[in-house]
């Protein structure tokens, strides 16, 4: 699939962008293909992630050219405040430096008033969005996520709410015994704007078992994201790399998202 506007100007060749002397044959072939509008394969992605030396500069130049073709030099940003409403969680992800047990020093669980207060403070400072996430508190009611959204919208109707990872959607839907589609649709009706595609880490089953044995499987994460899209909810998607992963799993992760 070619996501670029065919009416935008194309580079005549890779040589128009970089000095091709010394480029590896495979990387040169991949870059020439994408400049002609062909989508890189998963194997191509592995090769690009493993690139070194002069190949890296060529990859950067082509990537920048493709970005400019699609979006010009327009840059945008959002003034956002992250509000983590609880750090109490018992999932035991090996990389997490955030989670506390409920009886541990530093454990917290914000009230609705505290969450709204922090969002109001952000609004007064120019924020137009809040990102709301937290641990999976064992005493949390299934309606708590919708209660947060309703409280925020009652006080700040124009604030965009970007909230609840697929893991949290799974948790809330499970507690309310609802399908993911129905649960997300209910949150949308309450005022949820978008869902952060966090908790993705690396979408590889073997790696996830080692890092996050109690977390969502890659298949379940994808199922929930697809459920969100099916009811008209937009999401982001993240990647967490640099631990026990590598070029093969990075490329597979991105191709799965694509």
Report residues per predicted region.
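N-terminal pre-triad scaffold of radical SAM enzymes
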Residues: 58-102, 107-133
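Bulky hydrophobic/aromatic packing residues
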Residues: 4, 9-13, 26, 49, ...
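Flexible, active-site-adjacent loop/turn segments at secondary-structure boundaries
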Residues: 47, 73, 81-83, 87, ...
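N-proximal short alpha-helices
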Residues: 14, 18-21, 29-32, 88, ...
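Conserved Radical SAM active-site core
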Residues: 41, 100-257
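Flexible, acidic/Gly-rich N-terminal and inter-domain linker regions that tether
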Residues: 1-82, 86
């Amino acid at each position: 699939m070619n996501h670029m506007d065919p009416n935008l100007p194309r580079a005549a060749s890779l040589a128009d962008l970089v000095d091709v002397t010394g480029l590896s044959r495979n990387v040169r072939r991949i870059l020439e293909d994408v400049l002609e509008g062909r989508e890189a394969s998963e194997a191509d992605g592995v090769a690009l992630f493993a690139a070194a030396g002069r190949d890296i500069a060529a990859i950067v130049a082509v990537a920048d050219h493709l970005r400019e073709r699609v979006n010009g030099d327009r840059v945008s940003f959002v003034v956002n405040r992250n509000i983590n409403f609880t750090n109490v969680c018992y999932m035991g992800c090996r990389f997490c430096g955030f989670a506390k047990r409920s009886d541990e020093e530093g454990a917290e669980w914000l009230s609705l008033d505290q969450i709204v207060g922090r969002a109001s403070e952000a609004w007064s400072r120019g924020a137009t969005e809040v990102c709301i996430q937290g641990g999976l508190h064992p005493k949390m009611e299934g309606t708590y996520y919708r209660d947060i959204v309703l409280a925020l919208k009652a006080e700040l109707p124009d604030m965009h709410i970007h909230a609840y990872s697929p893991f949290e959607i799974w948790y809330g839907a499970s507690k309310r015994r609802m399908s993911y589609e129905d649960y997300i649709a209910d949150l949308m009706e309450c005022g949820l704007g978008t869902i952060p595609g966090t908790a993705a880490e690396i979408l590889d089953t073997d790696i996830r078992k080692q890092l996050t044995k109690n977390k969502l499987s890659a298949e379940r994460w994808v199922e929930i994201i697809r459920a969100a899209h099916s009811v008209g909810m937009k999401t982001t998607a993240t990647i967490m790399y640099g631990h026990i992963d590598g070029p093969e799993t990075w490329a597979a992760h991105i191709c799965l998202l694509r």
